[in-house]
A protein has these predicted regions:
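N-terminal beta1-alpha1-beta2 submodule of the flavodoxin-like/Rossmannoid cofactor-binding fold
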Residues: 1-105, 112, 196-205
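Flexible, glycine-rich phosphate/dinucleotide-binding loops
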Residues: 12-13, 46, 143, 181-183
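Conserved short hydrophobic patches within well-ordered secondary structure
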Residues: 22-26, 138, 164
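Glycine-rich phosphate/pyrophosphate-binding loop and the adjoining helix
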Residues: 27, 146-205
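A structural motif corresponding to the C-terminal end of an alpha-helix
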Residues: 29-30, 81-86, 132, 163-172
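Active-site donor-binding loop signature of nucleotide-sugar glycosyltransferases
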Residues: 42, 139, 177-179
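Helix-loop-strand module that forms the ligand-binding subsite of alpha/beta enzymes
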Residues: 69-153, 157-158
């Protein structure tokens, strides 16, 4: 089985961040069963993700500059990494009620017409492997699936489910480590419960 791990914490090399801590645990557990794991740490300067601009819309319409050629090649690399993976694990903190910007940049490079989806009359059809599973591990200070103030702001989960559905992937497992900043909560207990849930999920693959 080929695994793609996507780490999406802006503080990308801080192992004390809960998102990074869970990603490290997840990889340790996955390596007990699988050795074909590709990791993209989106905020690491060594992990280049092309940014959406006017040139990205015109790759096929003109002679490309060296930078545009490099961006197109990188986009093709990212597409191939995704297409060849059997499972995708995403580790991300919630930021301003939505996904972080580098993850959106990644999505802009893989959600491409006639590559991962096609347009038909009044609908879109995903072209990726429908048996592929995405696991979205999201950390947050608030409680977004239960708190009355936040349930209608749970955009990140809706976005991840929706965008992967567009490309044909409906198997999306959500693992939340939430309420981490609420004073009445036991943060360490929340993290430990999330670890247990993550390990159990990985063992079920």
């Amino acid at each position: 089985m080929k695994i793609l791990q996507i780490l999406a914490h802006p503080d990308y090399d801080n192992k004390n961040r809960i998102s990074n801590l869970l990603a490290e645990l997840g990889e340790e557990e996955l390596r007990k069963k699988y050795n074909n794991i590709t990791t993209l740490n989106l905020y690491d300067p060594k992990c280049y993700i092309p940014v959406m601009d006017k040139h990205m819309f015109n790759y096929d319409d003109k002679e490309l500059t060296k930078q545009e050629e490099a961006d197109k090649t990188r986009q093709e690399e990212l597409l191939n990494i995704l297409k060849k993976s059997d499972c995708v694990f995403i580790y991300m903190p919630l930021h301003n009620f939505n996904v972080v910007s580098k993850f959106k940049d990644f999505i802009d490079n893989i959600v491409i017409v006639n590559e991962t989806f096609k347009c038909e009359i009044e609908t879109m059809v995903g072209l990726d492997n429908t048996n592929k599973q995405v696991t979205f591990v999201i950390t947050s200070g608030g409680e977004f699936d239960s708190h009355i103030q936040y349930v209608n702001l749970d955009f990140a989960v809706q976005y991840v489910r929706g965008v992967f559905s567009v490309i044909g992937i409906d198997k999306v497992k959500i693992i939340r480590s939430q309420g981490l900043d609420l004073v009445h909560n036991d943060k360490q207990a929340i993290v430990e419960n999330t670890k247990e849930e993550l390990i159990k999920h990985i063992n079920s693959l």
